[in-house]
Amino acid sequence: DTLVIATADHSTGGMTIAKGKDYKWNPEAIHKMKHSGMYMTKEIAAGKDPEKVINEGYGIDFPSKQMDKVKQAAKDLRKLQKEGKDDKDPKVAEATTKLQNAIQEPINDASHTGWTTNGHTGEDVNTYAYGPGSSKFKGNMENTKSAQNIFDFFKNDVTSNQNQQ
Protein backbone atom coordinates (compact mmCIF):
# COMPACT_ATOMS: atom_id res chain seq x y z
CA ASP A 1 0.00 0.00 0.00
CA THR A 2 3.02 2.31 -0.41
CA LEU A 3 4.06 4.12 -3.58
CA VAL A 4 7.85 4.33 -3.87
CA ILE A 5 9.35 6.78 -6.41
CA ALA A 6 13.02 7.31 -7.21
CA THR A 7 13.98 10.06 -9.65
CA ALA A 8 16.10 13.17 -10.16
CA ASP A 9 15.24 16.70 -11.14
CA HIS A 10 18.14 16.84 -13.63
CA SER A 11 21.34 15.19 -14.73
CA THR A 12 24.79 16.70 -14.35
CA GLY A 13 28.20 16.25 -15.86
CA GLY A 14 27.51 14.83 -19.27
CA MET A 15 29.78 11.85 -18.67
CA THR A 16 31.69 10.55 -21.66
CA ILE A 17 33.31 7.14 -21.47
CA ALA A 18 36.27 6.23 -23.66
CA LYS A 19 37.39 9.80 -24.30
CA GLY A 20 40.31 10.28 -26.61
CA LYS A 21 41.45 8.82 -29.89
CA ASP A 22 41.75 5.19 -28.74
CA TYR A 23 38.09 4.96 -27.73
CA LYS A 24 38.68 2.76 -24.71
CA TRP A 25 37.41 3.15 -21.18
CA ASN A 26 39.41 2.05 -18.15
CA PRO A 27 37.05 1.78 -15.15
CA GLU A 28 39.69 -0.26 -13.28
CA ALA A 29 41.48 3.01 -12.52
CA ILE A 30 38.32 4.28 -10.82
CA HIS A 31 37.91 1.02 -8.88
CA LYS A 32 41.36 1.54 -7.37
CA MET A 33 40.32 4.86 -5.83
CA LYS A 34 39.92 4.80 -2.06
CA HIS A 35 38.15 8.18 -1.83
CA SER A 36 36.17 10.35 -4.21
CA GLY A 37 37.52 13.59 -5.57
CA MET A 38 34.88 15.46 -3.60
CA TYR A 39 35.93 13.77 -0.37
CA MET A 40 39.58 14.62 -0.97
CA THR A 41 38.65 18.21 -1.86
CA LYS A 42 36.75 18.58 1.43
CA GLU A 43 39.64 17.10 3.41
CA ILE A 44 42.16 19.48 1.84
CA ALA A 45 39.78 22.44 2.16
CA ALA A 46 39.49 21.58 5.87
CA GLY A 47 43.25 22.06 6.23
CA LYS A 48 44.67 18.57 5.77
CA ASP A 49 47.97 18.08 3.94
CA PRO A 50 47.23 17.82 0.19
CA GLU A 51 49.96 15.29 -0.55
CA LYS A 52 48.88 13.00 2.30
CA VAL A 53 45.20 13.20 1.30
CA ILE A 54 46.00 12.44 -2.35
CA ASN A 55 48.36 9.57 -1.52
CA GLU A 56 45.76 8.00 0.77
CA GLY A 57 42.82 8.60 -1.57
CA TYR A 58 44.24 7.66 -4.95
CA GLY A 59 44.85 4.07 -5.91
CA ILE A 60 46.90 5.01 -8.97
CA ASP A 61 50.08 7.01 -9.47
CA PHE A 62 49.42 10.72 -9.15
CA PRO A 63 51.61 12.78 -11.52
CA SER A 64 54.00 15.18 -9.74
CA LYS A 65 53.02 18.08 -12.03
CA GLN A 66 49.41 17.51 -11.06
CA MET A 67 50.36 17.37 -7.37
CA ASP A 68 51.92 20.81 -7.83
CA LYS A 69 48.57 22.04 -9.24
CA VAL A 70 46.72 20.57 -6.26
CA LYS A 71 49.13 22.18 -3.79
CA GLN A 72 48.82 25.56 -5.52
CA ALA A 73 45.01 25.34 -5.60
CA ALA A 74 45.00 24.40 -1.89
CA LYS A 75 47.31 27.32 -1.11
CA ASP A 76 45.03 29.73 -3.01
CA LEU A 77 41.98 28.40 -1.15
CA ARG A 78 43.68 28.64 2.25
CA LYS A 79 44.66 32.24 1.54
CA LEU A 80 41.00 33.12 0.99
CA GLN A 81 40.01 31.23 4.15
CA LYS A 82 42.64 33.12 6.17
CA GLU A 83 41.14 36.36 4.85
CA GLY A 84 37.92 35.31 6.57
CA LYS A 85 36.02 34.31 3.45
CA ASP A 86 33.66 31.36 3.85
CA ASP A 87 32.14 28.76 1.51
CA LYS A 88 29.40 31.17 0.44
CA ASP A 89 31.92 33.60 -1.04
CA PRO A 90 32.11 33.24 -4.85
CA LYS A 91 35.91 33.39 -4.76
CA VAL A 92 36.01 30.48 -2.30
CA ALA A 93 33.58 28.50 -4.46
CA GLU A 94 35.76 29.15 -7.51
CA ALA A 95 38.94 28.18 -5.65
CA THR A 96 37.29 25.00 -4.34
CA THR A 97 36.22 24.05 -7.87
CA LYS A 98 39.76 24.68 -9.10
CA LEU A 99 41.07 22.38 -6.35
CA GLN A 100 38.59 19.64 -7.15
CA ASN A 101 39.36 19.86 -10.87
CA ALA A 102 43.08 19.49 -10.13
CA ILE A 103 42.32 16.43 -8.01
CA GLN A 104 39.97 14.88 -10.59
CA GLU A 105 42.06 15.38 -13.73
CA PRO A 106 44.43 12.40 -13.27
CA ILE A 107 41.65 9.89 -12.62
CA ASN A 108 39.69 11.21 -15.59
CA ASP A 109 42.80 10.83 -17.75
CA ALA A 110 43.67 7.36 -16.41
CA SER A 111 40.12 6.07 -16.83
CA HIS A 112 39.51 7.89 -20.15
CA THR A 113 36.45 9.58 -18.68
CA GLY A 114 35.36 12.96 -20.00
CA TRP A 115 32.82 15.53 -18.84
CA THR A 116 30.91 17.94 -21.05
CA THR A 117 30.06 20.28 -18.20
CA ASN A 118 30.32 20.88 -14.48
CA GLY A 119 26.68 21.90 -14.53
CA HIS A 120 23.30 20.51 -15.48
CA THR A 121 22.74 18.58 -18.69
CA GLY A 122 19.61 18.22 -20.77
CA GLU A 123 19.08 14.49 -21.19
CA ASP A 124 16.14 12.63 -19.74
CA VAL A 125 16.48 11.24 -16.23
CA ASN A 126 15.11 7.87 -15.19
CA THR A 127 12.16 7.51 -12.88
CA TYR A 128 11.41 4.29 -11.08
CA ALA A 129 8.14 3.65 -9.28
CA TYR A 130 6.66 0.70 -7.44
CA GLY A 131 3.35 0.28 -5.69
CA PRO A 132 -0.16 1.68 -6.04
CA GLY A 133 -0.25 4.46 -8.63
CA SER A 134 3.13 3.52 -10.12
CA SER A 135 1.61 3.23 -13.60
CA LYS A 136 1.44 7.04 -13.70
CA PHE A 137 5.26 7.13 -13.81
CA LYS A 138 5.89 4.99 -16.90
CA GLY A 139 7.46 6.20 -20.13
CA ASN A 140 8.75 9.67 -20.97
CA MET A 141 7.14 12.63 -19.27
CA GLU A 142 7.94 16.21 -18.43
CA ASN A 143 9.29 16.72 -14.91
CA THR A 144 6.29 18.90 -14.10
CA LYS A 145 4.03 15.93 -14.91
CA SER A 146 5.90 13.81 -12.35
CA ALA A 147 5.31 16.49 -9.74
CA GLN A 148 1.62 16.72 -10.66
CA ASN A 149 1.29 12.93 -10.37
CA ILE A 150 2.74 13.08 -6.86
CA PHE A 151 0.35 15.87 -5.88
CA ASP A 152 -2.55 13.86 -7.33
CA PHE A 153 -1.45 10.85 -5.32
CA PHE A 154 -1.85 12.81 -2.09
CA LYS A 155 -5.25 14.18 -3.17
CA ASN A 156 -6.68 10.75 -4.00
CA ASP A 157 -6.81 7.47 -2.14
CA VAL A 158 -4.94 5.44 -4.74
CA THR A 159 -4.11 2.73 -2.20
CA SER A 160 -7.66 1.39 -2.46
CA ASN A 161 -7.30 0.78 -6.21
CA GLN A 162 -4.67 -1.93 -6.71
CA ASN A 163 -5.39 -1.97 -10.48
CA GLN A 164 -3.25 1.14 -10.92
CA GLN A 165 0.03 -0.75 -10.44
Task: Label each PLM-derived region with a short phrase.
Residues 1-164:
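A post-motif C-terminal structural segment
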